[in-house]
A protein has these predicted regions:
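Acidic/His-rich, divalent-metal-binding segments that scaffold phosphate/diphosphate chemistry
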Residues: 48-172
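Divalent metal-dependent catalytic cores for phosphoryl transfer on phosphate-bearing substrates
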Residues: 131-245
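Generic alpha-helical secondary structure signal
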Residues: 5, 57, 61, 76, ...
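OB-fold single-stranded nucleic acid-binding module
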Residues: 2-49
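Glycine-centered flexibility sites
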Residues: 14, 21, 28, 110-111, ...
Length: 247
């Protein structure tokens, strides 16, 4: 077995290694002579190696306060789905450290949380201008503001299962995307918290998740809440993409 085969057997994708040897320049390239390679597999803090957003405390406070102001049934779904406020530390840690995308926007650890807050704030402005303090006509009979905000909170929640983000950020080789998994997950969460949503409302929320990619997805937005969630998702992702990629 040659050295390359030995290394292939020793190393895996996202392995953290330490290399010790003599650094030298050969033909203009840096080389390490007589390398000794050690692989670390335990007690690894990937935030030391993987790009990560610094999430301000005030955004976490905003997230929690927004959830606490929701109607009780939507509040229960939001807390259980994200693991917020101590409900489930594992879920919360996954949610707050996951990426929003592999390349397009929010492609650092913490990107999913920041994108979620961006969509929430976009929806919040719509709620203020068209329901709470309408500038002309009120949409309170057309839009359930708390349900719409819940949709903003959970619309991308299953990106935690779609992406690898401990090490090289990449989409997993899976057939179902986060939209399909997200709709299924909310159904599971509803069962977990005592079926606080009836079948009609559960179907409505799940369909909004399935259709929030609009023309780029497999499900077409049907209701005004579907359309608004899709629009808010586009607004935040496009703005962040413009900022980060300077387009």
């Amino acid at each position: 077995m040659d050295k390359y085969e030995q290394l292939n057997n020793l190393l895996e994708i996202n392995s953290i290694i330490a290399v010790k040897g003599v650094a030298a320049i050969f033909n203009g390239n840096m080389q390490i002579r007589n390398p000794v390679i050690n692989v670390f597999k335990e007690n690894i803090n990937y935030s030391d190696f993987v790009p990560e957003y610094d999430i301000p405390k005030n955004l976490i406070n905003y997230f929690n306060e927004t959830i606490n102001n929701l109607e009780d049934k939507y509040k229960k779904i939001a807390i259980a789905a994200t693991g917020a406020m101590g409900y489930d530390e594992k879920r919360w840690n996954q949610f707050i450290t996951c990426v929003a995308a592999e390349k397009f926007h929010g492609n650092k650890r913490g990107g999913l949380f920041l994108h979620t807050v961006g969509v929430m704030k976009t929806i919040e402005n719509i709620i203020v201008d068209y329901i709470i303090n309408p500038f002309y006509m009120s949409a309170k009979d057309s839009i359930n503001k708390d349900r719409l905000m819940l949709k903003a909170i959970v619309h991308d929640i299953m990106k935690i299962k779609e992406y690898d983000y401990e090490g090289i950020i990449r989409r997993k080789s899976i057939k179902m995307d986060h939209l399909v998994m997200g709709a299924s997950y909310i159904n599971e969460i509803n069962n977990e918290v005592g079926k606080v949503l009836d079948e009609e409302e559960l179907d409505d929320i799940c369909y909004s998740i399935l259709s929030h990619h609009g023309e780029f997805g497999n499900f077409e937005p049907k209701t005004i809440e579907d359309v608004l969630l899709n629009a808010a998702d586009i607004i935040d992702s496009q703005i962040v993409n413009a900022i980060e990629n300077k387009i």
